[in-house]
């Protein structure tokens, strides 16, 4: 029987490929926050079992302007993903977001691109959703008062997601810019702006640090026994989270890579040994303890990992496909 002719590599061209494009507005429409939190929990479990590839993220720095990171990830059974994220703090003066991102999904069988989507909203909501997942897993069940330090993008996302995991009586919002705190507090019925961050932290059961501060925004002695503290700020040393708070209490991280030098790891963990930390995946898999007493202070320090982007982007893409959305670009 004659074998069919197989073209040589030199004869094969990619040709036009239909690619779904998803705008920032459509990503926001497609992503359900509760599904994202639950999806991230599964993602952390898989990461803890070694089932997700997340190579270290390389950085391109533009002196005096900002930097760009490349964040790839893949889990068997799903698409490959890469997010390109730019952090340019000066954009705020130009009325532009200081975090901008673009995500591309690739078919894991062929390597062909299948979707290009905005990653700016995904970066914002997945960061907050992972931190709020830490609240779900590590905060006391009877937590009633939360404080958010920072009234920017992360402060807003935290305010909207925290009620999904605890029934808070009150959420306090502090910002160096009181008007921003007032405006954000007005968007939620049980939120209020505060001017005294120390007093707010001292009466809190949950404290969420959501700033761009290059220095600690709270002091370790303000945090009362039984509190859960989360920190999502990503800045150079020493960062928003005081290191003595980390040293004195129980630390939880997304991944052991958090202890590597930036841009991979967290500035606040510089000089600390990774043996002091427990990964969120190990807690969720039951291979390490979470909260062990009502008086324990738990601390979650986020670095932001590509697994979170993979989970969020895959959720948005699959929902778009399920809703019959058609490819809108050809390459």
Sequence positions of predicted segments:
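Rossmann-fold NAD(P)-binding glycine/threonine-rich loop
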Residues: 232-288
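NAD(P)-binding Rossmann-fold cofactor-contacting core
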Residues: 164-187
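N-terminal ligand-binding/catalytic initiation module
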Residues: 2-3, 8-124, 132, 142, ...
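Glycine-rich Rossmann-fold phosphate-binding loop(s) that bind the pyrophosphate
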Residues: 151-152
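Rossmann-fold NAD(P) dinucleotide-binding segment
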Residues: 213-228, 241
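Phosphate-binding loop/pocket of nucleotide- and phosphate-handling active sites
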Residues: 315-331
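Short acidic low-complexity segments
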Residues: 189-204, 218-221
């Amino acid at each position: 029987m004659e074998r069919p002719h197989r073209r040589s590599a030199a004869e094969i061209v990619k040709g036009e490929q239909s690619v779904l494009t998803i705008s920032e507005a459509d990503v926001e429409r497609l992503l359900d926050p509760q599904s994202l939190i639950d999806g991230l929990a599964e993602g952390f479990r898989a990461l803890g079992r070694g089932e997700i590839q997340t190579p270290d993220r390389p950085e391109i720095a533009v002196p005096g302007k900002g930097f760009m990171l490349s964040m790839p990830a893949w889990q068997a059974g799903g698409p490959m993903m890469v997010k390109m994220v730019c952090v340019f703090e000066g954009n705020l003066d130009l009325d532009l977001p200081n975090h901008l991102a673009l995500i591309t999904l690739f078919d894991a069988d062929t390597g062909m691109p299948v979707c290009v989507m905005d990653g700016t909203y995904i970066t914002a909501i997945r960061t907050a959703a992972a931190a709020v997942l830490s609240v779900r897993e590590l905060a006391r069940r009877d937590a009633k008062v939360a404080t958010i330090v920072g009234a920017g993008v992360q402060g807003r996302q935290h305010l909207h997601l925290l009620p999904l995991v605890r029934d808070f009586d009150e959420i306090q919002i502090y910002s160096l810019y009181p008007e921003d705190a007032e405006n954000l507090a007005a968007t939620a019925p049980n939120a209020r702006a505060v001017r005294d961050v120390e007093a707010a932290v001292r009466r809190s059961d949950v404290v969420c640090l959501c700033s761009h501060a290059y220095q600690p925004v709270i002091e370790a002695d303000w945090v009362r026994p039984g509190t859960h503290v989360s920190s999502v700020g990503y800045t150079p040393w020493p960062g928003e989270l005081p290191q003595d708070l980390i040293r004195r209490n129980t630390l939880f991280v997304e991944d052991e890579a958090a202890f590597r030098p930036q841009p991979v790891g967290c500035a606040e963990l510089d000089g600390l040994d990774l043996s002091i930390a427990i990964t969120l995946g190990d807690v969720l898999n039951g291979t390490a303890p979470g909260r062990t007493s009502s008086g324990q202070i738990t601390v979650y320090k986020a670095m932001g990992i590509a697994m979170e982007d993979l989970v969020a982007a895959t959720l948005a893409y699959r929902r778009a496909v399920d809703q019959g959305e058609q490819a809108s670009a050809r390459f």
